[in-house]
Each structure stands twice: as structure tokens, then as C-alpha cells.
Amino acid sequence: MEHSIGRMKDFQGHFGILMRALTYILTMGSDGLKCASTTAVLNANYLQAQLKDDYNLPHDFICKHEFVLGGLKDDCDGQVKTLDVAKRLLDMGFHPPTVYFPLIVHEALMVEPTETEPKQTLDEFVAAMKQIAQEARENKDILLEAPITTVVRRPDETEAAKNLILTFKKGE
């Protein structure tokens, strides 16, 4: 510790994170931050409006930069869960949104598009979500078996949480 530069983390926060935030603010400037914020709100409201016909919308009002869906509207038997939707999104090349949060929304799916996403990407996401809703109505097995295009198929999340394997082992 004799040649240490000293403590990197204190009660004010982690220095590296604070530097990233400061760099972002200085790079964007006042006008850039306003534009990014406006675009984030616009993107979230656009997606919310596009998806509310196929997915439950527990809070149907203008949102900020994110919104929460409450599962599929037409899944009367409750067989298709939010986790199935998220896993199917992996097959379609999308990183799935946060699932099951907030806890007060049944089958919650928190969608938070970034401010840098172009409309084309948002429309592709909408098309994927609508396709998933259609698959839930017509052929639930596609969703219940997803993902099929990833290296790891469908792990048991409960078992994985209970018995963490934190080391990499090359396959047989």
C-alpha cells in the first residue's frame, strides 16, 4: 500500500463512474442533453403506443423514458409468461427488457429504449413483440421452447440461482 494512489471509492461515489458521467455531460452539452432526454421520452411513448393493443398496460398515461407492460393481453390461460416473451426476444436478436420488475405489476416487462435508437430499430422491436403476441395466440409452443437459436437453451433459473457455478468449464 506504500505506493498506492489512495482510496478510489468514498461516500461521494466511485471516481470512475463519476468521471464517465462528467465526460458524458461535458461531451453532450446543454443542448445535447435536452435532445437526448426528449428523444428518450419520445421513443418510450412511441413504443408504448405501438404495443398497448397486444400487451397489458397497467398505467396508460404518458410515460417518461420507460414504461411497464403487464404481460400478453390475449393469453387467457396464462400459459405464456413474461420470461417466455423475453426468451423469444433473444431468438429475434434483441436483448430483452427487464422482467418481473416492478414487483407490483403482474408479469411485468419494463421497456426502456435508449435515446440513440433510430425509429427503424424501434419499429423492428415493435414487429418482434407483435409477432410474439401472435405466436402466443397461434402456437404457444414456440414461446415455451424459446430460445432456440442461443448456445444455452432454457436453463432452470431457480436451480441456477441456488447453485451458482462461477467458473468456466470447457464442454466435453
Regions found by a protein language model. Give the residues of each.
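Long, C-terminal catalytic modules of enzymes
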Residues: 1-15, 20-27
